[in-house]
UniProtKB/Swiss-Prot annotation:
Upper classification of the organism: Eukaryota, Viridiplantae, Streptophyta, Embryophyta, Tracheophyta
GO biological process: mitochondrial electron transport, ubiquinol to cytochrome c
InterPro entries hit by this protein: QCR7 (IPR003197), QCR7_sf (IPR036544)
Entry function: Component of the ubiquinol-cytochrome c oxidoreductase, a multisubunit transmembrane complex that is part of the mitochondrial electron transport chain which drives oxidative phosphorylation.
Subunit and interaction comment: Component of the ubiquinol-cytochrome c oxidoreductase (cytochrome b-c1 complex, complex III, CIII), a multisubunit enzyme composed of 10 subunits. The complex is composed of 3 respiratory subunits cytochrome b (MT-CYB), cytochrome c1 (CYC1-1 or CYC1-2) and Rieske protein (UCR1-1 or UCR1-2), 2 core protein subunits MPPalpha1 (or MPPalpha2) and MPPB, and 5 low-molecular weight protein subunits QCR7-1 (or QCR7-2), UCRQ-1 (or UCRQ-2), QCR9, UCRY and probably QCR6-1 (or QCR6-2).
The protein, known as: Cytochrome b-c1 complex subunit 7-1, mitochondrial
Sorted UniProt keywords: Electron transport, Membrane, Mitochondrion, Mitochondrion inner membrane, Respiratory chain, Transport
GO cellular component terms attached to this protein's record: mitochondrial inner membrane; mitochondrion; plant-type vacuole; plasma membrane; respiratory chain complex III
Keyword Electron transport: yes
Gene3D superfamilies, per the entry: Cytochrome b-c1 complex subunit 7
Length: 122
C-alpha cells in the first residue's frame, strides 16, 4: 500500500502529480517564493525551532521573499518574466533541519523527557 501511494505522488511516475507540481511551481515563481516559504512557524513548534536553528542569512532571505510576495499580491502584479525564469521554487532550505528537529523531539518523547519548548508553570 505504501509503495502504491509513493508511486501515486511521485511526479516522475504519475502524470497528474507532474501536472500538479508544474502548477505549484508556476504559482510560486510568479511571486518569487520557494515551497519551504509556505511553512508557518506559528502552526508548529517544530517549524519554529527549525527556523531558529537556520543561519540568519537564510531566514532574512525568506523574510525578504515573503515581503516581496505580499507586496506583489497587494498590487495585483507578478514578478517580471526575467526574474520568474531564475526562481528556484523547489530548492529547499528547511526540510533537513525540520527532519532533524522532528527526529530529536521523537527521541526525547521516547526517552520520557519533556520537549525543549514545552512551557510549564512552577
Amino acid at each position: 500500500m505504501a509503495s502504491l501511494l509513493k508511486a501515486f505522488i511521485d511526479p516522475k511516475k504519475n502524470f497528474l502529480a507532474r501536472m500538479h507540481m508544474k502548477a505549484i511551481s508556476t504559482r510560486l515563481r510568479r511571486y518569487g517564493l520557494r515551497y519551504d516559504d509556505l511553512y508557518d512557524q506559528y502552526y508548529s513548534m517544530d517549524i519554529k525551532e527549525a527556523m531558529n536553528r537556520l543561519p540568519r542569512e537564510v531566514v532574512d532571505a525568506r523574510n525578504q521573499r515573503l515581503k516581496r510576495a505580499m507586496d506583489l499580491s497587494m498590487k495585483h502584479e507578478y514578478l517580471p518574466k526575467d526574474l520568474q525564469a531564475v526562481q528556484t521554487p523547489f530548492r529547499g532550505y528547511l526540510q533537513d533541519m525540520l527532519a532533524l528537529v522532528e527526529r530529536e523531539s521523537k527521541e526525547r518523547e521516547a526517552l520520557g523527557a519533556l520537549p525543549l519548548y514545552q512551557r510549564t508553570l512552577p
